[in-house]
A protein has these predicted regions:
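Non-catalytic alpha-helical scaffolds and adjoining flexible linkers that form interface surfaces
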Residues: 1, 6-217
């Protein structure tokens, strides 16, 4: 069984768990999504071999839409996390996100926080404070065009032209900065923005979790 691990000290680690598919395997009940583990690896190549495995803290239990959101978080992290590079802050963000999903908080806020923190940790932070050309603060009454990995620039866009996927209202950017996503239009704009930003690094291959969830994440 080929398994992708997110670790505190080594970033992403891909490893083979020999015999894990067997009914009596010592790994079978442990190698599950959202289960914190204590794991040892061996091998010199890119793909390691799983050694000892012990249960860590209590497993995260997700159901319904929150399960699909957790799957989305796992897949995005797996696709973007560099193997064998320490990302302690990113691991903490991942852990906090799963714990939050286990609760009853607003899923849109939880996911947008995760995505923004992920991009920042990987060096692609989105500046929601100012126009990258003029360095003027984002204005609630203006419209801005977004370029991934660059930022926002003021545009003469009007409400009639809002179908342009890269154009955002200043009021929505400010609301996202404050994680105030109560308005449906703001939550939709925030999701669109993060799809653009993440898409620049995820590539053209569709996310399986997004397909399962009907494209909503």
């Amino acid at each position: 069984l080929l398994v992708d691990f997110s670790t505190t000290d080594y970033g992403g680690v891909r490893a083979v768990a020999k015999g894990a598919r067997r009914e009596k395997s010592k790994y079978r009940s442990l190698l599950q999504s959202f289960h914190p583990l204590l794991v040892s690896f061996s091998g010199r190549g890119e793909v390691k071999t799983v050694g000892a495995v012990e249960a860590g803290l209590g497993a995260i239990v997700l159901q319904g839409e929150r399960l699909y959101s957790g799957m989305y978080v796992n897949e995005v992290l797996c696709r973007l996390l560099h193997n064998h590079e320490e990302h302690k802050a990113l691991y903490k963000n991942y852990q906090d996100t799963l714990i939050a999903l286990q609760g009853d908080g607003n899923m849109e806020v939880i996911l947008r926080k995760f995505e923004l923190s992920l991009l920042a940790e990987l060096g692609y932070a989105i500046n929601l404070d100012e126009d990258y050309l003029s360095h003027q603060p984002i204005d609630v009454d203006c419209y801005y065009r977004f370029t991934p990995d660059v930022g926002f620039e003021l545009t003469e866009q009007t409400e009639d032209d809002e179908q342009n996927a890269r154009v955002f209202r200043g009021k929505d950017l400010i609301a996202l900065r404050d994680f105030d996503l109560k308005e449906k239009s703001t939550a939709t704009a925030a999701k669109r923005l993060l799809r653009l930003a993440l898409g620049a690094h995820l590539g053209e291959k569709p996310l399986n979790s997004r397909t399962l969830f009907g494209g909503q994440r």
